């Protein structure tokens, strides 16, 4: 949504912790396949922690039940779709897609907002070997933490971004964290995006309690990510990236010491098989696959969640801070994008089955045609030649694929409605209604309606009280 940035000041404004703002910010940074979700309870992450099994075409087409087990191994032949078993009756669509849409690898990072009080410790950073390509910037200007929290996630993941954003990382590659912070704060492109979320001010006279309220409400955004098999808290007020559970993460796992070589070979073989046979979603999963390995058996989301809970407990138990408001936002792959990929897979299956029926002499017309050349890894989807020759079986596949498409389209509609509501909320938050309000009041006064309206409202309020 375009907004007026002509009078943007050099300072950075305060930003509300709101999914509609972060989603819009990501889109303007070029992260078109990324979205955010509000986390109302730490149990929200349970499904994502449990669903680590790599998704393959058998899961999407209802041949195998997706169990979500991290340690489940698949032989190469098991990845080949059994066309006779397409869309099994015993697999619940709702349960299937609830798991497939909450896959572990879809979460890129977690943003935590909290009120900084006297409890805040700015010495959490303990010196360690920080990876050279880990992007961390110190916050050198007030109120920039919201944008820095987003950048701390997207610049450390394989996410497509605008050239302006990618150039920031390239330009500041050899800078220390303070210089990286200066680079961010002096980037006009970023500052204009950030400051466009400043609500319009309708009255010049500030509230008499403004300064007091401002001093009391000091909130801060930080990010949690996994990077090279480690979990990091990226907080711009710290001296460096904080390694979470550093002692635990650096402990050697005795179960792995004896068989590292064999395990590595097995993992490589499994990875090669999976890479050849998984669909496009799996490729995206593997791009972020520093998620659950090398942390002494603990999952990075689980480690982050435990650390956030510990932070919340410390703040709640602190007698110096009476404001215990928090907010958690998960930055993840956009469900709308994932659902559309699944819809396209089922549309291709349906189209191929219909072509097979035509080849067998059935009098049907192709509808909902899809250009298969636009989609990668089509070899994972059963070819026309490999489909069964039984007409009844083929019609059954068509009917079930239609049900899958209809169900997914209902999920897609829900996601689109969420985005519409966010867009509407953004409009109301940042549209300047002042000229409209003043024009309305002037017209009411001109036609001698203002005084009567005022008296009616005054009488109404007096009656209520």
UniProtKB/Swiss-Prot annotation:
Site (Important for enzyme activity): 235
Compositionally biased intervals (Low complexity): 251-292
Residues covered by the ULD domain: 432-460
Annotated ranges, domain UCH catalytic: 11-333
Site keyed Transition state stabilizer: positions: 139
Function: Thiol protease that recognizes and hydrolyzes a peptide bond at the C-terminal glycine of either ubiquitin or NEDD8.
Name assigned to this protein: Ubiquitin carboxyl-terminal hydrolase UCH54
Gene giving rise to this polypeptide: UCH54
């Amino acid at each position: 949504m375009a907004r007026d940035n002509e009078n943007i000041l050099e300072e950075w404004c305060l930003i509300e912790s709101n999914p509609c703002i972060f989603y819009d910010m990501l889109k303007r940074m070029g992260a078109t396949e990324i979205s955010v979700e509000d986390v109302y309870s730490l149990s929200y992450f349970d499904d994502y922690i449990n669903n680590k099994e790599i998704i393959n075409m058998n899961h999407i087409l209802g041949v195998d039940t997706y169990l979500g087990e991290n340690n489940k191994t698949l032989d190469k032949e098991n990845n080949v779709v059994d066309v006779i078993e397409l869309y099994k009756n015993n697999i619940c669509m709702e349960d299937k897609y609830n798991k497939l849409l909450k896959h572990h690898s879809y979460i890129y990072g977690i943003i935590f907002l909290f009120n900084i009080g006297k409890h805040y410790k700015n010495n959490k950073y303990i010196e360690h070997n920080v990876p050279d390509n880990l992007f961390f910037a110190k916050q050198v200007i007030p109120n920039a933490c919201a944008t820095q929290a987003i950048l701390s996630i997207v610049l450390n993941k394989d996410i497509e971004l605008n050239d302006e954003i990618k150039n920031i990382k390239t330009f500041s590659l050899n800078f220390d964290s303070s210089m990286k912070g200066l680079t961010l704060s002096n980037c006009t492109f970023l500052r204009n995006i950030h400051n466009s979320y400043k609500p319009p001010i309708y009255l010049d006279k500030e509230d008499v309690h403004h300064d007091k309220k401002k001093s009391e409400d000091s909130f801060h955004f930080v990010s949690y990510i996994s990077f090279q098999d480690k979990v990091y808290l990226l907080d711009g007020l710290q001296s460096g990236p904080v390694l979470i559970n550093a002692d635990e993460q650096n402990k050697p796992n005795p179960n792995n010491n004896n068989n590292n070589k064999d395990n590595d070979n097995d993992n490589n073989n499994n990875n090669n098989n999976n890479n050849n046979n998984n669909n496009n979603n799996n490729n995206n999963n593997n791009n972020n696959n520093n998620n659950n390995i090398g942390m002494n058996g603990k999952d990075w989301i689980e480690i982050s969640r435990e650390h956030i809970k510990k932070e919340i407990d410390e703040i709640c138990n602190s007698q110096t801070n009476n404001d215990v408001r928090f907010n958690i936002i998960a930055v993840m792959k956009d469900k709308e994008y994932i659902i559309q990929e699944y819809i396209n897979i089922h549309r291709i299956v349906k189209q191929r089955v219909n072509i097979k029926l035509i080849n067998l002499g059935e009098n049907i017309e192709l509808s909902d045609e899809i250009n298969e050349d636009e989609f990668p890894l089509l070899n994972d989807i059963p070819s026309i030649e490999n489909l069964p020759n039984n007409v009844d079986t083929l019609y059954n596949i068509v009917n079930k694929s239609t049900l899958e498409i209809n169900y997914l389209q209902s999920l897609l509609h829900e996601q689109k409605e969420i985005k519409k509501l966010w867009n509407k909320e953004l409009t109301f938050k940042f549209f300047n209604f002042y000229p409209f309000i003043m024009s309305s009041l002037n017209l009411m006064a001109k036609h001698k309606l203002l005084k009567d309206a005022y008296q009616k409202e005054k009488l109404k309020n007096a009656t209520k009280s």
